[in-house]
Amino acid sequence: MKIIVLLLLAVVLASADQTAPGTASRPILTASESNYFTTATYLQGWSPPSISTSKADYTVGNGYNTIQAAVNAAINTGGTTRKYIKINAGTYQEVVYIPNTKVPLTIYGGGSSPSDTLITLNMPAQTTPSAYKSLVGSLFNSADPAYSMYNSCASKSGTIGTSCSTVFWVKAPAVQIVNLSIENSAKNTGDQQAVALQTNSDQIQIHNARLLGHQDTLYAGSGSSSVERSYYTNTYIEGDIDFVFGGGSAIFESCTFYVKADRRSDTAVVFAPDTDPHKMYGYFVYKSTITGDSAWSSSKKAYLGRAWDSGVSSSSAYVPGTSPNGQLIIKESTIDGIINTSGPWTTATSGRTYSGNNANSRDLNNDNYNRFWEYNNSGNGA
């Protein structure tokens, strides 16, 4: 009986800070409020199809020397039948661009685990167009389906910027990415955006994958007025600054978010959503784990997130209801002791001070407040 009582007490203590309505620095949803935020509501009527890796219409490493060549071939066949691209285990130093196409693609690693198949490149946002062309230009010809994506980056002046730093870029709907690793290996001690995966389309599925990088690892949704839904399951995502960011509707279920400290240890931010203020659904983290390097356990300087106020130059230029207002729910997940528990959210990219709504009666989409919420999380950082 004593053991049972102690265990129950431990559970209560671990979840004590998850009591609704929370505090102004850490708002918590009530049970009834949390019912508005489920996988189904974020999917918004989409039923993701099952994923199969039992066939291969194209094989990279046996018939195709690059992933891009296999993607081009699949798109050029036309039609609306799903095409399957198998990537044999190995390391591929290249970019992969999937332009808008009606051909649904499944791209999967042929190894026994996602670590066996790695797509990697060192390509930060500060890369010059000439260096970019030297890195990836050999992959593209003017008649290729994705040439316009390449050319838009190659023709930039100065540097290529955040979007063009992407290693794996998806602009087509209904793409499935399975059992592989995508890495942008760029690393320095300052601010250096370097995107591993970017999705600018709808109905994207990422399963059993690894997304590796530091700053801006995953760019999930462009923030356009169109619907951009993506569904991540059993996927590992690592980084340090804003390493999950963007304006799409993204569901992360049974995923791991790992905060690294090998590049910088002064601060870290996991999520930076850029949700349109008229959209109710941004990022949904469900039954997942947020953890990281031991350096954050002692300093407690890592933050769960901040708002990416894209296009807003300063806090005084922010207009509630017009400017972006990132939306994020973390629900029934484990948050390790790497997070500043008393203040897990930090100042927006515009300089706008974080403002949480812990009123007993509240509008969860009131744009005078940040739209960051938690429900029924556990762990030393909850």
From Swiss-Prot:
Pathway: Glycan metabolism; pectin degradation; 2-dehydro-3-deoxy-D-gluconate from pectin: step 1/5. Its main location: secreted. Glycans are attached at residues 179, 340, 376. GO terms for molecular function: pectinesterase activity. It catalyses: [(1->4)-alpha-D-galacturonosyl methyl ester](n) + n H2O = [(1->4)-alpha-D-galacturonosyl](n) + n methanol + n H(+). Keywords: Aspartyl esterase, Disulfide bond, Glycoprotein, Hydrolase, Secreted, Signal. One of its GO terms (biological process) is cell wall modification. This is Pectinesterase. It comes from Sitophilus oryzae.
